[in-house]
Amino acid sequence: LGIGSTIGPQYLLPAPPVPLGTHPDGGPYTATAIAAGSYHTCALLNDGKIKCWGHNNYGQLGQGHSNTIGDQALEMGDSLPVIDTGGAGRAVSLGVGTYTTCAAFVDGRISCWGMGLGGGLGLGHTSNRGTDASHMGADLAFAEFGTDLSAVKVVAGGRGGVGVGTVTCALFTTHAVKCWGEGADGSLGRGDLTDIDTPEELGDNLDPIDLGDLGGSYPVDLSISFASGHVCAVLNDGRMKCWGSNSHGQLGIGDTQRRGGAADEMGESLPFVQTIANDFVVQVATTTTSTCALLASGVV
């Protein structure tokens, strides 16, 4: 919670604000976006920098060590450094998975740190990043998603508990969507259950997800569940498609069969989510076993 203790929020009502510290210009840091994983939280700050706190056993806080931050006094505020992303520039999108953190930067690159299992960091290996100072700063590694692509949004997820793995998806200026990492449950949308975790599978060899003939429409937003592995893409015309795990009907297509794990499940074969009266989807949020959509009418 970033409040300098492990006392549950029910004992601290009203909940105290998280101290983000002081900006170098003398004013307070403010958050423009926040994202939470299983046991860590990150804030995108008003200058494009990032601060994270919580569990850090895989380096997901990006501080070059594996110590928990935020459970003791004097660890937050000015005591918590911004993550050293070297010369990457401002972050424009923040994706926090089960045990990973990803950022898309103003130059279109993506970097992820934390758990590498499954290949969700996009580096062509499954080693953890962020647990050592040599992983950050000038040595920050960037995901290999292909040439002539510039990311505008990144989302991170994966599965928790037994069989834990990592998944990352990105939306590009071309409106293409690519996913990499653990392929279980079809969350990569590639028509198989294979992990994407080697150099040979990344870069230009990584194909965009086939969403079928969208009639000139295109994805404008993404959401991924951080603990079970399903992904949803919202189109500019308000329609939405989801794929991956579907054990509780979270894909919104009227059954509990996963999608994306077999060759005939994507493209034209992947149905659109049926909303109330086919209302326009404005925003989507995914949880472990459910999906929620804010519709243009204001209904959720």
Predicted regions and their residues:
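Eukaryote-biased RCC1-like beta-propeller repeat architecture
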Residues: 1-300
